[in-house]
Regions:
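C-terminal catalytic lobe of FAD-dependent flavoproteins
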Residues: 295-373
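Active-site substrate-recognition segment that forms the wall
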Residues: 20-25, 34-35, 48-50, 87-92, ...
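Helix-loop-beta segment of a Rossmann-like dinucleotide-binding subdomain
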Residues: 87-100, 112-113, 119, 123-170, ...
Length: 373
């Protein structure tokens, strides 16, 4: 039986961020990942936009405030990870251009701008010509837009690798192919059994298994956590744009990487655990992206990536203790903001595991859905 100080269930971006942070505090940490890191987690099919401004009108105010706090942490957090891992995570602060293709789109941008100003976010209106100056790949259909200088991007797949490297450099360990079969408390210790027959025992467990979290939590630990999978597909194209600025319309986003890749997303499909991407969804992504960026037509289609976002009933993440003894914690419900909220989530859980509190922990307390036994 392996006996670390903390077991983290889930090797996605949230689980690895939490594990890496806890390992930095001197704890012995083991991460149990059901597949291979980056294979089936939501981040593997994410574009990596850090976009509190672009999504200010479609996100609960509490979640936007959380995103802004995490956003402030990002530059220093990324710099530390890149130094520890010896690799770039594709962090780019070129900003985002949100464009409209007709009068209806421009009206939506007015509402978006109003939401942004309520949060004190920087935004600047653009004419069609100004938008094309900032992203020369834009086509003639663009009639106006907004420049969001504080909406950035990171490559989630590289971020996962960097987190794992930094975790291991801090003495942590990732066990792949370790799907959790049961989680039970015995003599003050949590015993985590995998489907492969292995067992890990620890005083503290953090379940950060994304959409799978409710399946991992023991039934007698409290009421069901209202998290469900929402499938999303993105397209990976084998060429970049003329600049690394992200392009968004009200219907699609296009994220160019500096090294010659472009990610187009994303579908939102309530279809349970079915993994296959639908042709109709792929068609819509291509149709909408090429309306703004005709050059998409000439790009090689390299991959259709599918992931399951952990959606939660009130669209506010659940991060904190799930039992009264503060030995079982959860970190899930981030939906489309797991990459963006990873540093804040890790900081909140470290503070809680240290026996303290975090100024934002009350907003994300998972027991708001019903007190655990």
């Amino acid at each position: 039986v392996v006996t670390p100080d903390v077991v983290v269930v889930g090797g996605g971006v949230v689980g690895l961020a939490v594990a890496e942070e806890l390992a930095g505090s001197g704890r012995r940490v083991v991460v149990l990942e059901r597949d291979r890191v980056g294979e089936t987690c939501a981040a593997a099919a994410a574009a990596g936009m850090l976009a509190p401004a672009a999504e200010a009108d479609a996100t609960p105010p509490v979640t936007t405030q959380l995103a802004l706090e995490s956003h402030r942490m990002y530059p220093e957090w990324v710099a530390r990870l890149e130094s520890a891992s010896g690799m770039s995570v594709g962090f780019d602060r070129s900003g985002t251009v949100v464009v409209g293709l007709d009068a209806d789109d421009l009206r939506e941008l007015v509402h978006l701008e109003q939401a942004q100003r309520r949060f004190g976010l920087r935004t600047r209106r653009l004419s069609a010509a100004e938008a094309r100056d900032l992203q020369p790949s834009l086509g003639p259909s663009v009639v106006g837009g907004l420049l969001l200088e504080d909406d950035w991007q990171v490559d989630p797949r590289r971020l996962l690798q960097a987190l794992q490297r930094s975790l291991e450099a801090r003495g942590g360990r990732v066990v792949e192919g370790a799907e959790v079969r049961s989680l039970r408390r015995q003599d003050g210790t949590w015993r985590v059994s995998t489907r492969g027959g292995d067992e890990v025992a620890a005083r503290t467990v953090v379940v950060a298994a994304g959409a799978w979290t409710p399946q991992v939590l023991p039934a007698d630990a409290g009421p069901p956590l209202p998290v469900r999978p929402v499938r999303g597909a993105v397209l990976r194209l084998g060429a970049g744009l003329e600049t690394a600025r992200v392009v968004r319309t009200p219907r699609v986003y296009v994220v160019p990487r500096a090294w010659g890749e472009t990610v187009v997303g994303a579908t939102v499909e309530e279809r349970g655990w079915a993994r296959e991407a639908l042709a109709g969804g792929v068609y819509e992504l291509l149709r909408e992206s090429r309306r703004a960026l005709p050059c998409v037509d000439e790009m090689p289609l390299r991959e259709v990536a599918v992931g399951f976002r952990p959606a939660i009933r009130d669209n506010v993440p659940a991060v904190g203790a799930w039992d009264d003894d503060r030995t079982l914690f959860v970190a899930t419900g981030h939906y489309r903001k797991g990459v963006e909220l990873a540093p804040l989530t890790a900081a909140v859980l470290r503070r809680l595991l240290d026996g303290g509190d975090h100024p934002l922990s009350s907003y994300v307390d998972p027991r708001r859905f019903g007190r655990a036994a």
